[in-house]
UniProtKB/Swiss-Prot annotation:
InterPro entries: ATP-PRT_HisG_long, ATP_PRibTrfase_cat, ATP_PRibTrfase_CS, ATP_PRibTrfase_HisG, HisG_C, N-reg_PII-like_a/b, N-reg_PII/ATP_PRibTrfase_C
One Gene Ontology term, aspect cellular component: cytoplasm
Keywords, sorted A to Z: Amino-acid biosynthesis, ATP-binding, Cytoplasm, Glycosyltransferase, Histidine biosynthesis, Magnesium, Metal-binding, Nucleotide-binding, Transferase
Alphabetized Pfam families for the sequence: HisG (PF01634), HisG_C (PF08029)
Protein name in the entry: ATP phosphoribosyltransferase
Gene3D superfamilies: 3.30.70.120, Periplasmic binding protein-like II
PANTHER family: ATP PHOSPHORIBOSYLTRANSFERASE, ATP PHOSPHORIBOSYLTRANSFERASE ATP-PRTASE
Organism: Halorubrum lacusprofundi (strain ATCC 49239 / DSM 5036 / JCM 8891 / ACAM 34)
Domain of life from the UniProt record: Archaea
Gene for this chain: hisG
Role summary: Catalyzes the condensation of ATP and 5-phosphoribose 1-diphosphate to form N'-(5'-phosphoribosyl)-ATP (PR-ATP). Has a crucial role in the pathway because the rate of histidine biosynthesis seems to be controlled primarily by regulation of HisG enzymatic activity.
Family: Belongs to the ATP phosphoribosyltransferase family. Long subfamily.
GO biological process, one term: L-histidine biosynthetic process
Activation and inhibition: Feedback inhibited by histidine.
Needed co-factor(s): Mg(2+)
Amino acid sequence: MRIAVPNKGRLHDPTLSLLERAGLHTEETADRQLYADTVDPDVSILFARAADIPEYVRDGAADVGITGLDQAAESGGVADSASAAGDDDLVDLLDLGYGSCKLVLAAPEDGDISVVADLAGGTVATEFPNITRDYLDRVDVDADVVTVTGATELTPHVDMADAIVDITSTGTTLKVNRLAVIDDVLDSSVRLFARPDMVDDAKVKQVLTAFESVLAADGRRYLMMNAPKERLDEVKDVIPGLGGPTVMDVEADENGNGMVAVHAVVEERDVFATISELKSVGATGILVTKIERLVG
């Protein structure tokens, strides 16, 4: 199986990090910039431009791809399941939780466009013409779409367009260029995509499970402690855990009191308060560790 991943840019490093955490360590090859083997002999990596990855998957050069939803939607259809996918659609298998951004419709702050309907008969400049046309159809506004390849935010100020559809993460670039958001067009993040015929492939399912286990571990910590057996119910009340804590008998303490070892998965944000509560009910030897993967 071949996975297409971004070869550079802001998505490259977090994607490689995800592969590593999922257990797909990449091996050095003679042509590392084009492809790489992994520790799994049945899985290899293809490095490509983020915008080209959807076509690599559609054409069969890769079996699955990791890229932004904006790139996949611009290149063609995207479906939530194989049964809902058309012949040329990609199936959105998993939101990988990084690379979040929005495609927005924006216009000059001091201009005549304050709502979408004001754009009727006007012109929109964008690097995403297909998404923009689909959006205009959805909102039933007739406007021309001009395709540009960069500096989209400048086009309204040089009378090239009345508004733009562009990517924003923080909104800073729009504010600097005195542009106001009129409407949200698309919420995007990095996703795992596959062709419909690959959704039920055993290796694809294995990779999907590995990625899901990484995401499930994010924001969680593993707690281990010893506690008096007689106060176990109090400990359980403090840390219900993921499906309940794991409890094991251990040797009695120096006074002969029965003890148990308690292990639980907790939310990272709760660790600070949880430790104080655990100590108050007699827990000792509390250990907090990171979780690399959590398989449900």
